[in-house]
Curated annotation (Swiss-Prot):
GO BP term, pick one: ribosome biogenesis
Top-level taxon in the UniProt lineage: Bacteria
Subunit structure: Associates with the 50S ribosomal subunit.
Recorded GO MF terms: ATP hydrolysis activity; GTP binding; ribosome binding
The organism of origin for this protein: Vibrio atlanticus (strain LGP32) (Vibrio splendidus (strain Mel32))
Name of the protein described by the UniProt record: GTPase Der
Residues annotated to bind GTP 1: 9-16, 56-60, 118-121
Occurrences of domain EngA-type G (ranges): 3-166, 206-379
Keyword Nucleotide-binding among record annotations: yes
Database matches in PANTHER family: GTPASE DER
Length: 493
């Protein structure tokens, strides 16, 4: 499973700075969708070949007695369900009553925690950290999140136990290297590795995660999909943050249904108050191929829904949206709901939207048509010649802009990975292309390849000049001739 790191601390200690550094996105097209809220509290982070989820739990401000009331309920749940807690304090401001209150609260949770003293750049780190020994910690870690100093070692220490556990579980050797430079760009797959990834995906069942806010009908939809008389035997022992994985078959296609709400007998569904778990939902998104977001038609789409969609986009997951409880609404309300969806979901205009009733089964069957379509789009093999031809057509329709007096030249394109589809474009100065032109290329590929239900990632590689590192080496006769010419030029002066 993907480890979860929670950032905890009072306001203005640098949690957002560290969050932004950890959740940086290589390709602006992945994160910078028009209309997508940027006020995210959780995100996907990369450490070498290791992925993890990072959660900014928000600032706590107040006295010890105010900890329970000042901290949001979801933040408490996120801390409780996280694998590691990074307790951040401000080295310049020193120890405060809020820091003491938070430390006491974390001790009660008995959660693996690391005290992180931030903002130690330009000052004596040991002197700035001295007061924090009063918190009774065994060790503390000094960083400057704004400049990235110390972040590599911190993340290495936090994730190393999980890398070892994963290595033992898979019987593989895990290579944890340094945290990659923020400006560095790399291609996820070579063409050969992309081909291997394609073959692997064809042999696997589709992992479908049903996510959404509490009481939107996730359990009802799950039971509808599995069948009315299905006896629930999937509540296997495990931690409360583990989702339930249910193998199933539909239309001669194998699936694994990832249920974040828990499958319950129908008679108990209405009696159970569902507890929403952010961590459980994020882990389900990470582990899925296709994400099905369920929305209640009787409620407005929330910022939380948009944040979940944004997380799914950044994770590269295919997306299908279902609006539940559609039956019984009058036409005026339906029109208003559709307009609101169009207004707020423009950044996922590639995703199919279905209007269903999970309770009565209306429209549920069509969901799997879109799930299969999205997965097929995410895993369809496209050759280098086709991708290059589409790229040439795009540049003929709209030339790349000039950069520093020279026009950007796109040479060729090839597949760089699947699920999501990754297109690698090689050329001169391609990394200097503006986001607007990158978005034009992405939309052009989507229309040309008829890709629906999945985000597209385009990565750019500057072609290397094979003669750039070479110097002209003159022969002896050439050296003599050059000297004679130089002396003649000087003589004329």
């Amino acid at each position: 499973m993907v480890p979860v790191v929670a950032l905890v601390g009072r306001p203005n200690v640098g949690k957002s700075t560290l969050f932004n550094r950890l959740t940086r996105t290589r390709d602006a097209l992945v994160a910078d969708f028009p209309g997508l809220t940027r006020d995210r509290k959780y995100g996907h982070a990369h450490f070498s070949e290791h992925d993890f989820i990072v959660i900014d739990t928000g600032g706590i401000d107040g006295t010890e007695e105010g900890v329970e009331t000042k901290m949001a309920e979801q933040s408490l749940a996120a801390i409780d369900e996280a694998d590691v807690v990074l307790f951040m304090v401000d080295g310049r401001a020193g120890l405060t009553p809020s820091d003491v209150a938070i430390a006491k609260h974390l001790r009660q949770l008995e959660k693996p925690s690391m005290l992180v003293v931030n903002k130690v750049d330009g000052i004596d780190p040991d002197a700035a950290s001295a007061d924090f020994w009063q918190l009774g910690v065994e060790d503390m870690y000094q960083i400057a999140a704004a400049h990235g100093r110390g972040v590599t070692a911190l993340i290495d220490l936090a994730l190393n136990p999980f890398a070892e556990a994963l290595k033992a579980e898979n019987g593989e050797v895990s290579d944890l290297t340094e945290f990659e430079d923020e400006e560095e760009e790399q291609v996820d797959f070579t063409e050969e590795e992309a081909e291997e990834e394609f073959k692997r995906l064809q042999d696997q069942p589709i992992k479908l995660a049903i996510i959404g806010r509490p009481n939107v009908g996730k359990s009802t939809l799950t039971n509808r999909i599995l069948g009315e008389e299905r006896v629930v035997v999937y509540d296997m022992p495990g931690t409360t943050r583990d989702s339930i994985y249910i193998p199933m078959q539909r239309d001669e296609r194998e699936y694994v249904l990832i249920d974040t709400a828990g499958v319950r007998r129908r008679k108990n569904i209405n009696e159970t108050v569902e507890k929403f778990s952010v961590v459980k939902t994020l882990k389900a998104i990470e582990d899925a191929n296709v994400v099905l977001l369920l929305i209640d038609a009787r409620e407005n789409i929330s910022d939380q829904d948009l944040s979940l969609l944004g997380f799914a986009l950044n994770a590269g997951r295919s997306i299908v949206i279902a609006v539940n409880k559609w039956d019984g609404l009058d036409n005026d309300v339906k029109d208003r709901v559709k307009k609101e969806l169009d207004r707020r979901l423009g950044f996922v205009d590639f995703a199919r939207i279905h209007f269903i009733s999970a309770l009565h089964g209306t429209g549920v069957g069509h969901l799997f048509e879109s799930v299969q379509e999205a997965y097929k789009s995410a895993t369809t093999r496209v050759g280098t010649s086709v991708l290059t031809r589409i790229m040439k057509m795009a540049t003929d329709d709209h030339q790349p802009p000039m950069v520093r007096g020279r026009r950007v030249k796109l040479k060729y394109a090839h597949a760089g990975g699947y699920n999501p589809p990754i297109i690698v474009i090689h050329g001169n100065q391609v990394r200097n292309l503006p986001d607007s032109y990158k978005r034009f290329l992405m939309n052009y590929y989507r229309r040309s390849l008829e890709i629906m239900g999945t985000p597209i990632r385009i990565q750019f590689q500057n072609s290397e000049n094979p003669f750039e590192a070479k110097t002209n080496k003159l022969t002896i006769s050439q050296e003599r001739k050059r000297k004679r010419m130089m002396s003649m030029v000087k003589g004329r002066k």
